[in-house]
């Protein structure tokens, strides 16, 4: 099974619409063939319209950084997956450790969001990852496997084949620390084996698994050389056109 690599920028709470348009203008003609690498930017909700308009006709896919699990209703401040689909968005990040930590999102919330995202014809990027304390206690596999089982509960094999799982050890996000390529591969392999146990070998071979946590041009090639790492979820290094282009064109 040949899985198309996917490099996704997660802009977090950075960039305004003007900066977004300038960024896309700088990268849109230099992106790799989408059959070789899928190039994705996940932007704040206030930038999505500018991103969509600027990226029109290019190889750049567009993602949101979060959504709610209801399409509409009295949910002040939330983002509708239905409206994201109507806007032409492709992916939605859910379960990021910053959402789990700062906004107290639970595994149940993330599972509901995954179902709502699929119900609206979008694709989730489901984040998982352990704290430094969990790793030092050598309980990282149990922790991440538990997150995966909870997030995928009730999803079909076909749905799981079409989603992306992003392994982001919390201790490596924005810290400059990176899991070694062997540590990252070990956990991504465990995630794939978990999908196989929950579904079947075909589903496990189809699902794409990213590594996230201080991914940058200097380490992307080594990470992407590992058999179970299919992409990167990139924070700070995705904010500058030059470094983003180095990341998505890592095969050159």
Curated annotation (Swiss-Prot):
It catalyses: D-glyceraldehyde 3-phosphate = dihydroxyacetone phosphate. Disulfide bonds: none annotated. One of its GO terms (cellular component) is cytosol. The active site is at residues 96, 168. Substrate binds at residues 10-12, 174, 214, 235-236. Its EC number is 5.3.1.1. GO terms for biological process: gluconeogenesis; glyceraldehyde-3-phosphate biosynthetic process; glycerol catabolic process; glycolytic process. The keyword Isomerase applies. InterPro entries: Aldolase_TIM, TIM_sf, TrioseP_Isoase_bac/euk, Triosephosphate_isomerase, Triosephosphate_isomerase_AS. It is found in: Cytoplasm. Keywords: Cytoplasm, Gluconeogenesis, Glycolysis, Isomerase. Signal peptide: none annotated. Pathway: Carbohydrate biosynthesis; gluconeogenesis; Carbohydrate degradation; glycolysis; D-glyceraldehyde 3-phosphate from glycerone phosphate: step 1/1. The keyword Cytoplasm applies. GO terms for molecular function: triose-phosphate isomerase activity. It comes from the Bacteria. Belongs to the triosephosphate isomerase family. Homodimer. Involved in the gluconeogenesis. Catalyzes stereospecifically the conversion of dihydroxyacetone phosphate (DHAP) to D-glyceraldehyde-3-phosphate (G3P). This is Triosephosphate isomerase. It comes from Lactobacillus helveticus (strain DPC 4571). The gene is tpiA.
């Amino acid at each position: 099974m040949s899985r198309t690599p996917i490099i996704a920028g997660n802009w977090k709470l950075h960039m305004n619409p003007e900066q977004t348009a300038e960024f896309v203008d700088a990268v849109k003609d230099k992106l790799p063939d989408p059959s070789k690498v899928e190039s994705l930017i996940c932007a704040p909700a206030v930038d999505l319209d500018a991103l969509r308009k600027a990226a029109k006709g290019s190889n750049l896919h567009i993602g949101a950084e979060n959504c709610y699990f209801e399409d509409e209703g009295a949910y002040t401040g939330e983002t509708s997956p239905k409206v994201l689909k109507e806007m032409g968005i492709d992916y939605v990040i859910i379960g990021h450790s910053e959402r789990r930590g700062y906004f107290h999102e639970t595994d149940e919330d993330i599972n509901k969001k995954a179902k709502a995202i699929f119900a609206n014809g979008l694709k989730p990027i489901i984040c998982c990852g352990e704290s430094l304390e969990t790793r030092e206690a050598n309980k990282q596999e149990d922790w991440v496997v538990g997150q995966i089982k909870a997030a995928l509960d009730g999803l079909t094999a076909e749905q799981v084949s079409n989603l992306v799982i992003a392994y982001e050890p919390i201790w490596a996000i924005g810290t400059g620390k990176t899991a070694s390529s062997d540590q990252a591969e070990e956990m991504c392999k465990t995630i794939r084996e978990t999908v196989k146990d929950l579904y079947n070998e075909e589903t496990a071979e189809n699902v794409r698994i990213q590594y996230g946590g201080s991914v940058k041009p200097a380490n992307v090639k080594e990470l992407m050389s590992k058999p179970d790492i299919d992409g990167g979820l990139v924070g700070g290094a995705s904010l500058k056109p030059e470094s983003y282009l180095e990341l998505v064109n890592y095969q050159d």
